[in-house]
Structure formats: C-alpha cells, structure tokens
Amino acid sequence: MINLYLKEETALVKTATIYGINGPVIYLKGNTGFCMSEMVYVGKQKLVGEVIALDKDLTTVQVYEETTGLYPGEEVIATGNPVSVTLAPGILNNIFDGIERPLERIAESAGAFITRGVSVDSLDRTKKWPTHITVKQGDYLHAGDIIAEVPETHAITHKCMVPPGIEGTVLVTVADGEYTIDDLLVRLQLPDGDTKDLTMTQHWPIRTPRPTHHRFPASVPLVTGQRIIDTMFPIAKGGTAAIPGGFGTGKTMTQHQIAKWADADIIIYIGCGERGNEMTQVLEEFSELTDPR
C-alpha cells in the first residue's frame, strides 16, 4: 500500500513565523508541527516552499521563489500535503518549471518577467475533453485499471487510471461525452464501505516514484535520426544514454537533435543548469516542429 498522505481538505491550518532567512532557505523556530517534505506558503505573497529538515525546535524550509523582501516574523502556512503535481490531460504541449507551474500562462497574466507569488492552475480546468468510459457498473477495479480514454492529441490517447492504493466496485459511471479534468467519471465503493470519486486528475507527490506493475526488457532499438549514433552507439527504447564531454563539445546540440528526430511518440525535454540562450533555442525551435506522423 502506498501512503501519499494527500488530503482533500485540512481541518486545522498549521502556521508558524519566520525566525531566520539565508538566501532561498528560511528557518522556523519552535515546534511547528510541520511534516517532512510538506508544501508551505511563505510570507504575504504566499511563496511556494518545501520543508527540507526538521530538528527539535527548528524547521528548515526551502523556498522555490525569490526571497528578497521577506523578513523575520512573516507567517508560514502549512498545506498538509507534500509538494505535488497534477497529472491529467493537458500536460502535453506545455512548458512547466520544476514544480509544474505553467510558464506560458504565468507570462500571459504577469508578463515576461515573472513576478513572485503568482498562482495559476497547472492545467486548464475549464477545457472539455472527449471522453470514452471503459468500465461499467459492477466492475471491480484495482490500482492501475483504465477507467477512461481521452484523445489528448491526434497521436496520443491519454488513459485515465485508478490511482495507486485504491480499489473497489464501480457504483456509478457517466456516459461517453465531453468532460473537464475535474468532472466525475466513475464512483467506486471501497472495501471499507466508503466511496471514492474518480476524475481524469491525479495529484502526485514529486518525490514519490510512480509505481509500475512490471518492466519490459529493452530489446527494440531507438532510431535517433543521427547516423553516427545509430551505427556506433545504438540506444534501446526504454534504455538510458549519456553524452559526456568537455565545454563546447556539442553535448546540448546532440541532445537537441535526438529530441527533434528520434522515433518517439512523446518528447519530454528537461533543462537543468542550461544556459539561457540554449533554453531559448529549445523553446523557439521545438514549438515550430511538426510531427510528420
């Protein structure tokens, strides 16, 4: 059983005050009652932070936004949940930062120079998606069973599944149609008699790996579109490759070429520690590429 300690609502809001600040790290004095890896809101602008250390009378929080202007005595509010991301149709064709804040939508509301404390939903909660329900009343479902299929793009069908740690009998299903990511699709009766409403959305802690039923062996080659790599250094689908090299030897450019031309259905580009001009190139060029399939 996977314990995610995700709470739909928190009955008692826990708060604390800032005792000290050191760059992106803040310190809270006393017994705060906060949990390790818990998401918190810091200061008047409600900057996003995460509890990274707990001592007897000192709580350490890392803030994921600029801390300039914060001062001791400002309030820190606990959410009762770990730092999590929203998994649902609409993730594809988006640009997110490391905690799934949608940078394009933030730029629309706050401008190109993103200000602190901007709160925007990660995904569009008003868009309706054509949905095909794959279960019926009376079915007994386990974690990972598919309850609905949503064509997210012309090439990718998003399969909505029962969340990990959940199983039960289907009480209610909706008819095929168009629904938002928060609309009820299936209602389950759990073994303890409670009910659980399932939507297209799952909230998942960023530090908890997604569970797998089993892994397939890496036996099919990944055609990268780069002849020297496909001939001399073949990569397997499901495998891992590394590009070592010194400064200016073309590591990033090779990565860009593989991302552009590899025989893959979905490309997830993660830029960590990249130069600003290289990320700009990714955003400009990748957005103009057309999948010939």
Which residues make up each language-model segment?
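N-terminal accessory targeting/assembly segments
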Residues: 1-115
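Short, compositionally biased
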Residues: 53-59, 89-100, 156-177, 196-210
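Short histidine-centered loop motifs in beta-beta connectors
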Residues: 63, 68, 130-140, 170-179
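P-loop NTPase nucleotide-binding/switch module
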Residues: 108-165, 180-240, 254-257, 292-293
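Hydrophobic anchor at the beta1->P-loop junction of P-loop NTPases
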Residues: 243
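P-loop (Walker A) phosphate-binding loop of NTP-binding proteins
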Residues: 246
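ATP-binding Walker
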Residues: 249
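Conserved P-loop
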Residues: 252-293
